[in-house]
Amino acid sequence: MTNSNSITPVMQQYVTLKQQYKEYLLFYRLGDFYELFFDDAIKTSKILNIVLTKKGNVPMCGVPFHSSETYLNKLVKLGYKIAICEQLETSEEARKRGYKSLVKRDVVRIVTPGTIVEDSLLEAKESNYLACIVMIKDSCAIAWLELSTGLFCYHMTYISKLDSDLLRIGPKELLVADDLLEIEAVYSIIKKYRFSITQYSSSFFDENRAYNTLCNVYGVSTLKGLGDLKGVEISVCGSLLEYVIATQKGSLPKLGFPKAYVQSDFMFIDAAALRNLELFSTQSGELEGSLIASIDFTVTASGGRLLKRCLSAPLASADAINRRLSVVEFFVNNQNLYKSVRQVLRGIADIERILTRVKIARCSPKDLYSLKLTLEKTCELVELLCKFNIDIISEFCLRLGRYEDLICILNNSLLQNSVSSVKDGGFINPECDAQLSEYIYIQECSNQLIQELRDRYRNITNIQSLKILYNNILGYYVEVSSNHLIDDKNFIHRQSLANNVRYTTTELKELESKIISAKDASISLEIKIFGQLCSDVIKYADKITITAHTIAEIDMLTSFAELAVQYSYSKPIIDDSYEFNIKKGKHPVVERNGKFIANDINLSSEQRVHLITGPNMAGKSTFLRQNALIGILAHIGSFVPAEYAHIGVIDKVFSRVGASDNIVCGYSTFMVEMIETAAVINQATERSFVILDEIGRGTGTYDGLSIAWSVIEQIHNVNKSRAIFATHYHELSKLDKYLKHIKCFCMKVEEWDGKVVFLHEIIPGASDKSYGIHVAKLAGFPQSVVNRAEYLMDKLKTNEDLLT
């Protein structure tokens, strides 16, 4: 950076601010542009593909203020953090302090991937979490906050479950201590993710410091009356808040006290299962082809976010699940109603996020107008639902609430074409304020008022050629020819020219002042009225929050009804038994691709482990995933793709299916397989649901068979989980002879005229063939290679020497 003694006052101001925000790209406001200088300019110009110029020896680039959010969006998505420096006064205000006074500037907020609240920077149906992990000795806690909605949770966890926690939460930014990343077990997990990482020294996470932050934020002297936070939980929640306060420069919305995420209330889906089952994205990272893409019929942003939260943490209480199922069933049985409800929902804005922007004084007139329209739509929802005298629906009506008074205030004050920024005015109804009406009248009628005054002066002076003109030096002035001098003390001489004489009057000066200042005055008054409207909205904040949550829930449940009706899903029976009985079940994603063969499964207590043999390509993996997905769908309160489903509550879902066959963190494929299998046998309970595919295939035959055999015994005898185990080891089919709760099944195959047909049906019994050579033929192996493989297989069957 250039020597500070050789640069202009403006650049000195920039350098001083940049020293305070070294880790951020500094967007420095100069007039209608945000400018970047030095290394920031070089880096940003490359990222944004904008022109890099120089002023002297100083590299610089800039983006227009009015379109800055487009550029911010790109930078934030790439994980950059930006300090926004604004002008805190006008140049006129600066000159009042002295002719050469520099306009005051300061950083007013810091934009980071986990702390954004602007709609233009957020994905509508994606939560935008900032997370924090703190470890003290053997205790580990994680907290996460979505600033745009106020959702704030914390959870005690273990390093072994950290991968699952991070995958479930999906933060955009992670706050950690430097020394935490020095722990290999933690670093190996975190480095797999693409979120932005913000590091501080361990002193930032000090418990006493965090305690004081929490007390200051919630305005209390002790935390005892607010919750059961202790030790590392205090550290993780307080540190997270301190970081948010720093990024928002003190402009923090009113947040509820952090809520404990109680794992026992929710189904635990381990990281391998979240990935292998493709709940949120395919193995290639695409949304299309994932479970959520197949079941998301929500029509509001908040409903979409709720669906994703529910899918990442399904319910684990039969009562809670059945409450949702009852609502879905009600809507399925009243299709005209749910279609009408969904039509109303389509006109609803994201008031959860709008409310946060109102609280931190970062909302726009358009936001308030959208809020007004949504509250009107809420009244329509209540009218639709209150016709049904059913408890679960009446509860929705109560929680939706009514807002006649607030709607009236907003209706009377806001113009329909409300704009996205307050800086230019034009969004407040002039009829709501007499002073504003006068300002607007002056602006709209300035030409007419000048002409009326001109006509009056012509009558007074008897000079019909008299004109009222304007220039930047004199402002408005009266002009007559030199032959028609005005002899009236009310007309003050200003200027004499060769052919004309110019005058002014007190009345003309006052009118000029009104015309020139009316625009600024009207904008200032509109901003003041807008501030009062925001204060009026904040009075309803708690009620609006409940309404927003209710809208999201109604949207999600009516989307489940749409899913059930469109694809003929059935209502599952959910209870506290250990049943898993599915008739004519289908894979909710794969069935959309065309004809799909439905299959049954009954993992009752008498046959809680199913061992499935059969060739590759026959559909074993699809069948395994299908049943895990049916179980998960049932636990979020959705109907399921089956004719019948009876499912006892599942506490955990584990999956070791081939989709993880890649090298992660330097581990071999086989090591990854063993790690995922170890998680199953170490954590699964008798309420868990386990799917295991081809355990042991990544090593030698005897090693693999021995591992697979012992894993099945462990799950059968110790874990006692409901499990489906697919294998190519036909020897394992002997296990049903001495493990009484195992039943063998295989994939149905027909052979005809030398051809093999995979029927994708599950039937009782064990397969005695792998059909591997046939699959190789289907894959396009040359016939010579296929023939050679068949010849060698025949020799192996008769124990002949392959080299003879």
Curated annotation (Swiss-Prot):
Gene3D superfamilies (alphabetical): 1.10.1420.10, DNA repair protein MutS, domain I, MutS, connector domain, P-loop containing nucleotide triphosphate hydrolases
Gene Ontology molecular function terms on file: ATP binding; ATP-dependent DNA damage sensor activity; damaged DNA binding; mismatched DNA binding
Superkingdom of the organism of origin: Bacteria
Alphabetical list of Pfam families matching this protein: MutS_I, MutS_II, MutS_III, MutS_IV, MutS_V
Database matches in InterPro entries: DNA_mismatch_repair_MutS, DNA_mismatch_repair_MutS-lik_N, DNA_mismatch_repair_MutS/MSH, DNA_mismatch_repair_MutS_C, DNA_mismatch_repair_MutS_clamp, DNA_mismatch_repair_MutS_core, DNA_mismatch_repair_MutS_N, DNA_mismatch_repair_MutS_sf
Residues noted as binding ATP in the record, renumbered to the chain: G614, P615, N616, M617, A618, G619, K620, S621
Record-level GO BP terms: mismatch repair
Keyword vocabulary terms for this entry: ATP-binding, DNA damage, DNA repair, DNA-binding, Nucleotide-binding
Family according to the record: Belongs to the DNA mismatch repair MutS family.
Role played: This protein is involved in the repair of mismatches in DNA. It is possible that it carries out the mismatch recognition step. This protein has a weak ATPase activity.
UniProt-recorded name of the protein: DNA mismatch repair protein MutS
Organism: Ehrlichia ruminantium (strain Welgevonden)
Gene: mutS
